[in-house]
Amino acid sequence: MALNLQDKQAIVAEVSEVAKGALSAVVADSRGVTVDKMTELRKAGREAGVYMRVVRNTLLRRAVEGTPFECLKDAFVGPTLIAYSMEHPGAAARLFKEFAKANAKFEVKAAAFEGELIPASQIDRLATLPTYEEAIARLMATMKEASAGKLVRTLAAVRDAKEAA
């Protein structure tokens, strides 16, 4: 379907606005994936706070200008599906990684986080980032473990002091 100039400008404005508020972006090639599977992916994306859109490469290049995702420009080749993580930096990467496991034809091209290009081979770096809740839980576990260790060492020191006296 041919797009007129106003439609193209609207697409660029929409994607650019989303890019400015996004935490990370992942680019993939969805050629060969069935419509049903793509619908499932889009639904999972909405639930995970991921904005997904298939956009023409020239429009996408214009949309990412001046954003931290400008480093992805070289990945805009062939059919391009872009996903922006809006709530958690690893959400889109995690979603695409899981989807690629189940669908051999789905290929992750690259990702970007804080202006750094992450090649597809290293997508796990972004996908394994803990969520906010997971990070807080790990921190609390570490703090709790450290205080318990201090208590044990203190009690051992008191016991040793009593035995020495």
Curated annotation (Swiss-Prot):
Keywords, comma-separated and alphabetical: Acetylation, Repressor, Ribonucleoprotein, Ribosomal protein, RNA-binding, rRNA-binding, Translation regulation
UniProt KW Kinase keyword: no
Protein name (record): Large ribosomal subunit protein uL10
Subunit structure: Part of the ribosomal stalk of the 50S ribosomal subunit. The N-terminus interacts with L11 and the large rRNA to form the base of the stalk. The C-terminus forms an elongated spine to which 2 L12 dimers bind in a sequential fashion forming a pentameric L10(L12)(L12)2 complex. Two L12 dimers associate with a copy of L10 to form a very strong complex (called L8).
Matching SUPFAM superfamilies: Ribosomal protein L10-like
Keyword Protein biosynthesis attributed: no
Misc. comment: Ribosomal protein L8 appears to be an aggregate of ribosomal proteins L7/L12 and L10.
Gene Ontology cellular component annotations, sorted alphabetically: cytoplasm; cytosol; cytosolic large ribosomal subunit; large ribosomal subunit
Family from the record: Belongs to the universal ribosomal protein uL10 family.
GO biological process: cytoplasmic translation; negative regulation of translation; translation
UniProt modified residues of type N6-acetyllysine: 37, 105
Stated role: Forms part of the ribosomal stalk, playing a central role in the interaction of the ribosome with GTP-bound translation factors. Protein L10 is also a translational repressor protein. It controls the translation of the rplJL-rpoBC operon by binding to its mRNA.
